[in-house]
Swiss-Prot record:
Originating species: Solanum lycopersicum (Tomato)
Cellular component GO terms held in the UniProt record: extracellular region
Subcellular location: Secreted, Cell wall
Name under which the protein is recorded: 64 kDa cell wall protein
Keywords tagged on the record: Cell wall, Secreted
Keyword Secreted assigned: yes
Length: 14
Protein backbone atom coordinates (compact mmCIF):
# COMPACT_ATOMS: atom_id res chain seq x y z
CA UNK A 1 0.00 0.00 0.00
CA UNK A 2 2.76 2.41 0.98
CA UNK A 3 6.21 2.90 -0.52
CA UNK A 4 9.08 0.94 1.07
CA UNK A 5 7.61 -0.14 4.37
CA UNK A 6 8.28 -3.18 6.59
CA UNK A 7 6.27 -6.35 6.00
CA UNK A 8 4.24 -5.60 9.11
CA UNK A 9 2.73 -2.16 9.30
CA UNK A 10 -0.64 -0.52 9.89
CA UNK A 11 -1.23 -0.55 6.16
CA UNK A 12 -0.21 -4.20 5.96
CA UNK A 13 -1.42 -6.22 8.97
CA UNK A 14 0.07 -9.38 7.48
Amino acid sequence: ANAKVPSHTISNPF
